[in-house]
């Protein structure tokens, strides 16, 4: 990463100069370390400011349904990955998620594979890709990495359990929900779905709304039916208010 290398080179150069002018080695080292830290923070902020500006522009394009333009902008920002640590992972997460939400799973997969592990939604999508490719071991490993990075996400634990249950491993699905409850004591959705599995029922995920539907684990017909039911409920509430 260029920012680290530049900061380290500057620190070493200053250390050498200070040693040549007979400054005690420990004092020179302290100055060099301070320079390294300060310069690295400064360069990182400059780089991230550029990256965030591109992400903000891409976000506006997404809101305007200009998906391909947003993807091009994010891909262009990958050049900053050489400068700053974790930038590539964050950008690959965003690109992969856009492709995935467009149902372009083949293009989404290679970007999701390079996702930042703390982007739990991208990691969830990657795990689902492994599940659909009949790679259960990789699915489990991906979910384990995701819950380690984002242990307080209720949907992530429920999604993990859902996929395990879909793979026919109800016991492991229950264990995932139990682990989730240890991280999120009293979480209503985790408790409800654990009870559902214990009673031999299906997991209920629709209460998560659009956050759940973005994973495309339900058919379009089921999603449309849910949306129509929700629309009908809103219309009934409006009618009651008018009365």
Label for each model-derived stretch:
Residues 148-186:
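Compact, basic/aliphatic-enriched, mixed alpha/beta core segments that act as assembly/interaction modules
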């Amino acid at each position: 990463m260029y920012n680290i290398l530049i900061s380290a080179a500057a620190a070493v150069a200053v250390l050498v100069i200070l040693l040549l002018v007979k400054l005690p080695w420990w004092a020179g080292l302290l100055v060099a370390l301070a320079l390294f830290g300060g310069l690295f923070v400064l360069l990182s902020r400059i780089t991230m400011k550029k990256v965030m500006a591109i992400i903000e522009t891409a976000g506006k394009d997404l809101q305007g349904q200009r998906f391909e333009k947003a993807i091009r902008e994010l891909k262009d920002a990958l050049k900053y990955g050489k400068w700053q640590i974790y930038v590539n992972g964050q950008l690959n997460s965003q690109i992969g998620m856009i492709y995935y939400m467009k149902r372009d799973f083949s293009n989404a997969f290679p970007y999701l594979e390079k996702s930042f592990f703390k982007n739990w939604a991208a990691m969830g999508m990657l795990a689902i890709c492994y599940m659909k490719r009949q790679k259960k071991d990789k699915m489990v490993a991906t979910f384990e990495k995701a819950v380690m990075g984002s242990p307080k996400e209720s949907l992530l634990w429920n999604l993990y359990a859902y996929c395990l249950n879909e793979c026919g491993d109800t016991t492991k699905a229950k264990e995932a929900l139990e682990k989730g409850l240890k991280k999120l004591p009293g979480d209503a959705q985790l408790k409800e779905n654990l009870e559902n599995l214990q009673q031999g029922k299906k997991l209920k995920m629709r209460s998560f709304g659009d956050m759940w539907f973005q994973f495309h684990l339900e058919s379009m017909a089921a999603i449309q039916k849910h949306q129509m039911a929700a629309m009908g409920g809103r219309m009934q509430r409006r009618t009651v208010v008018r009365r």
